[in-house]
Amino acid sequence: MLFIHVFFQILLFLVSCTIVFSLFHFLVTGNTPSVSTPDWVIGKMAENREIKDGDIFYDLGCGTGRLIFNLSEVFTGTNFIGIENSLPQYLFARVRSFFLKRRNVSIKFENFLKTDLSDADHIYVWIYLRDIKLLKEKFEKELKSGCYIYSLDFPMPDVPVYKTIELKKTSKFGHTLFIYRY
């Protein structure tokens, strides 16, 4: 019983530190704050039939890795790579990786603007328009033909949309998933 109590205290401490450090990271760097993709949106992503065995799926700014860990259960033959540059979020994702032991998931601590994406078949982002503009240039230089880009809520300027999915929840708020194909 003591072990469980200590475990949950440590877990609560890690979650609290993640929130505080994420807020600090946002205030100091001005980078996109860490907000997890809602579970119901992840569920809609899991219905995606374009993801195949052997594909490589990047989550740029993966946070705690919730999206890729959930999708890795559905798409067991796909390799998922999370890229995160916030140390607390990265460490949380690594701890999650240790406990979940998913062989098709890896987490990297690096700036996604410096990540080589030339092997990507799928890329997911939920970031501000300012950062999407930077990524657009990177995508045009690096991505192979046929790569899918999934951008939640923020469209890429001057790039034709392959598909738009209005993700509705029962509440008054929903999301839009913009899908691009390079």
Report each predicted region and the residues it spans:
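C-terminal substrate-binding/active-site "lid" region of AdoMet-derived donor-dependent transferases
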Residues: 131-182
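Conserved SAM-binding loop
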Residues: 93-94
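S-adenosyl-L-methionine
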Residues: 1-52
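Conserved SAM-binding motif I beta-strand of class I
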Residues: 79-84
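Glycine-rich SAM-binding Motif I of class I
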Residues: 65-69
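Conserved class I S-adenosyl-L-methionine
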Residues: 53-63
